[in-house]
Amino acid sequence: RDRLRSRGLGDVYKRQELAAQDPQAPAADGTAQNDTTSQHTPEDSVLLTPEQIQQALDSGALEDAEAQCIDLTDENGFFRWLFNWLFGSKAKEEEPAPAYSGWRTENGKTYYYAQDTNKKVTGLRSIDGKLYYFDANGVKQDNVTFGIDVSKYQSGLDWNKIKKSGVSFVIIRIGYRGYGAAGNLVKDPMFEEHFTNARNAGLKVGVYFFSQAVNENEAREEAQGCAYVLNGRKLDYPIYFDTEASGGKNGRADGLGVEDRTKCAIAFCEEVKAQGYQPGVYASTLWFRKRIDLNRLKSYSIWNAHYNVAGSPIACDMWQGTCTARIPGYGGQIDVNISYVG
């Protein structure tokens, strides 16, 4: 989501391939190194007699084909035939399986193999214009509830196409608090359009407020601002307190400690409840672990952002699994979420 926040959220070993020097490779003067081939007589071409081959087989000396050095020249047609007869089947068994991409069903489970890696995909994926979710083992999961989140930075959406892609809900930014000492409350200029169009397309709706509250009073003001904009309109999903770093890393609340940030989140959520709505808190895994006390927020809906994984690493009601999805109905990249509560 292109709101005011940071998406931030070797020792490289250089391998030098050392080729073993071929004793028969041409030297700089054009002659062969250790040129013993010129000393061969016709009888030298036959290295082993059939009797010697049989003795070697009986003793196990030829058990490992890769360890043998048999001169398979045109003169040794018999040995070439014998070598292929002995070890040909083994070579066939060791041929790698052909690369595969696309959908595949194995033991009653459905997987999708990526075209670029030929490996099973995991996590949230958009494939041929439809959203899918694959668990950590690459198994496609059914009955998944997909949603997106949007703000003024996403415009020109075709909500009917978005719904057909598998999206059933949207979380819309209702507003934010500005920079500076004043910290004015601002309604997202695209909120009404997004809200109306999403409803008309039959999508369920929730909202979030990008907070920069530095104390509990400001957090309550933000919640009251959300209720004022909604003006009694019903929601299907919570009003989320969005806490994260500002885009310029110089936001009013960026320097808050864990205790103060947690108090702001609680004050916001309690005021949302007082206004008759369901409250929730949005943050990344890092923030839930380091910047805010998750244990004190578990009575509220938790919306966790964590990308490039097969699922949320913390318990939550909603998981934002990617910010780079591409789906029909929107020309750019967009956040996609999974709701675990329907």
Give the residues covered by each predicted segment.
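Substrate-binding cleft of extracellular glycoside hydrolase catalytic domains
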Residues: T145-A267, K273-Q275
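Functionally critical loop-and-helix segments that line ligand-binding/catalytic clefts
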Residues: D142-Q154, N295-G342
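N-terminal propeptides/leader regions of secreted preproproteins
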Residues: K14-E94
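Aromatic-lined carbohydrate-recognition surfaces of secreted/lumenal glycan-active proteins
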Residues: V272, G276-R289
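Structural recognition of alpha->loop->beta junctions
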Residues: A227-F241, A245, I292-A315
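Hydrophobic anchor at the start of a short beta-strand
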Residues: V205, Q278-G280, I302
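Single conserved hydrophobic/aromatic residue that forms the stacking wall/gate
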Residues: R1-Q16
